[in-house]
Amino acid sequence: MTVTALSQLSLPLFMGTTLNAWSDALAGFTPWGLPVGLLIIAAIPLVFIALYALTYGVYGERKISAFMQDRLGPMEVGKWGILQTLADILKLLQKEDIVPLSADKFLFVIGPGVLFVGSFLAFAVLPFSPAFIGASLNVGLFYAVGIVALEVVGILAAGWGSNNKWSLYGAVRSVAQIVSYEIPASIALLCGAMMAGTLDMQKITILQSGELGFAHFYLFQNPIAWLPFLIYFIASLAETNRAPFDIPEAESELVAGYFTEYSGMKFAVIFLAEYGRMFMVSAIISIVFLGGWNSPLPNIGAFELNTWTSGAVWGAFWIIMKGFFFIFVQMWLRWTLPRLRVDQLMYLCWKVLTPFAFVSFVLTALWEIYVP
């Protein structure tokens, strides 16, 4: 689908379904309080989607870990142990919330909150389906990357506020790692934005739609897209502190990293924020390179597979499944690859990924200029 077709046909159809469009339409003839209230009510499903992804990411981690080790994992609480995570939340709610006497109480308390807010706010710009988009921003991709990077503030507050040398070491490692890997990750995403000609995640998704299914996805349209795709996926592992980049939480060196001193629900919030970041980076890579809500199935003759598997409900299904696939790969790698050393981590970022990211940026620009 061309940019002209997008502006003439698709945008009026899709933009009218976003939550902020509903608010703008109501603001013209109602008091300001009603649109705000309706917007909050309409955002409730977004809250449930985010909490569902965060909560059952823990369950998925346990089951996948058990599968890798030829175990069963949680089985007792609910069918197949599906309520185990809820039981753990109830347990953590009853635990004592301990604040070390020597800790900076303000920083110690706000650290987990900043982490969780950073993970949750990024969900607002994710286009889950043609009929459900929290906010369609013309800089949506930039917003998502920036909000996810907000975790640096929470991590540093948690590590410094704990007044514990292991927590501080873990926080410094994590901040250095995240800030470093933001560079190749951002350049890789710019390659996707260059192919689409926009930073609006909704438009990026629409431009990858078509009856040929996966053939319209940028990963298959442009052979160069495989390079930024792999660069962003590797960098996203480092940004989410997943193996083999889980150096900030190295148990044998730092006990538990920057959240060593946390207990009760503060510990749970930090844990949930990590799974929120995992889903967020997985959703971003699905939107930019794999068509987001678009069905990968093509229309083949009389079998209109793409037509049958498109729409609001199917759109949400596809983007969630694509996101869960990358989450599965992240969990799989945890039990496959050994942890890197700090020097190896930085070498990979500055000497390998960053140069290749610049190369992919130049190649993508040349492809967009000279290949019709």
Swiss-Prot record:
Keyword Ribonucleoprotein: no
Location(s), subcellular: Cell inner membrane
Catalytic reactions on record: a quinone + NADH + 5 H(+)(in) = a quinol + NAD(+) + 4 H(+)(out)
Any one biological process term the GO annotation gives: aerobic respiration
Biological role stated in the UniProt entry: NDH-1 shuttles electrons from NADH, via FMN and iron-sulfur (Fe-S) centers, to quinones in the respiratory chain. The immediate electron acceptor for the enzyme in this species is believed to be ubiquinone. Couples the redox reaction to proton translocation (for every two electrons transferred, four hydrogen ions are translocated across the cytoplasmic membrane), and thus conserves the redox energy in a proton gradient. This subunit may bind ubiquinone.
Family that this chain belongs to: Belongs to the complex I subunit 1 family.
Assembly notes: NDH-1 is composed of 14 different subunits. Subunits NuoA, H, J, K, L, M, N constitute the membrane sector of the complex.
Name the record gives this protein: NADH-quinone oxidoreductase subunit H
Gene that specifies this protein: nuoH
